[in-house]
Structure formats: structure tokens, C-alpha cells
Amino acid sequence: VWHAADPSQYPPMDVHGTLPWSVLDAASPRWRERVTWWRDHGVDDTSPRAHAQGMIATGRHGRISGGVSRFDPHLAEVCYRWFCPPGGHVLDPFAGGPVRGLVAGHLGMPYTGVDLSAAQTAANRARAADWELAGLSAGGTVWIDGDAADVLPRLDGRYDYLLTCPPYHNREKYSDDPRDLSAMRWGVFVDALRGIVAAAVDRVK
């Protein structure tokens, strides 16, 4: 958990009923209630990925999410509250949908996300603009189009916290772009992922 020099500045440990125990129960009523609040306010937008080439269309995941992975907004919320300084700048090299950016903006934390899909980043910016108009976000959410391997070394400054969700190799295939990790063979994927993670860590204070 992030610690301030002055204990009086420690962040709240109780985040809508979730406490920093060893096991987080995402099936608990309080957790589900908070996830519902976020999603009722439009925290996610999976439409740019809904027609990607290879989604998980079978089993429970295919039934509840149309085969598109969705980042848990309350998980993002507790991670930010517990591990990022108040107002800290978040870096996300595999941004995907808008969840982590919108949650950061709602909590008053600047956010910089990078994603290869221009359609997804455009959708994210549109959703963020809606949130700012509705008073749900303090702004400061930025999405950059491009390959994180190229973008990260060019970023200015340092970041306070790194939170991301890398591709699951070929479990979800987004495009045939040779820079797309989901289109790579396993060995190439691992090397590319390691390089991007190392570059992202290098940008953190």
C-alpha cells in the first residue's frame, strides 16, 4: 500500500467496503454493487473490439461479455486508492477500453494510455468527454494512438503508477497488424511483451 511521509495523509483503506486483505472477493454483494454503479454510468465501451477477428465466443465468458474481456472498474478503483499517491499520474501501455482511464479521471488522477487501435482510442476519448460534461471526471485522461514499444521511449516526464492489462496472446485476436501482440507467434509475443513492460517500468518514478 502507498505510504505518505505523514500518516495523516494515508489514503483511505476502505474503498466502498473493500479492504486490502489477501483475498479480494469480486463476487461479494458490495463489490458487485460497486461494479454495477460504474457500468451503469457507462465506464466501459467494448464496441470497437466486438467485431475483432478472434474473440472468445464460447462458454460463460462468451455469454456474459460477447467474448470481449472487460476490466473490472472496482479493481481499478481499489488499486488506484491503495497503491497510487492522491493525484498521481497513471501510465497504461495496453489501454484497450476506457475503464482504467475513466476511473482514474473520476478519482482526480491524470492518466496516459497507449493503444494500437485508433478506433478504440477514439471511442475512449468520446466517452471521457461525456464523463467530463456529466461531472464524473476531472479530466486529464489522455489516450495515445500507436505501438507502446515506440511511444513509451518518447514520453516526457515520469509517472507515479503503472496499471495495465496486456493482451492474452491469441485468446483475443484484434487485427493482422504485425505490431499487434495478439497476432504474434508465442516466442515473438513474449519478447515484445517483455520489452514493453520494461519500457513502461522505466517511465515510473
Q: Can you describe what each PLM-predicted range is?
A:
Residues 55-58, 83, 154, 169-174, ...:
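A short His-aromatic
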Residues 151-157:
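Short amphipathic alpha-helix with an adjacent loop that forms part of the alpha/beta core around
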Residues 72-77, 149, 190, 194-197:
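Short, well-ordered alpha-helical scaffold segments within catalytic/effector domains
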Residues 158-199:
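Mobile active-site "lid"/loop adjacent to the S-adenosyl-L-methionine
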Residues 64, 68, 113, 181-188:
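Pocket-edge positions in alpha/beta enzyme catalytic cores
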Residues 76-151, 200:
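Conserved S-adenosyl-L-methionine
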Residues 203-205:
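Helix-to-beta-strand junctions that scaffold the AdoMet/dcAdoMet cofactor pocket
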Residues 1-85:
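S-adenosyl-L-methionine
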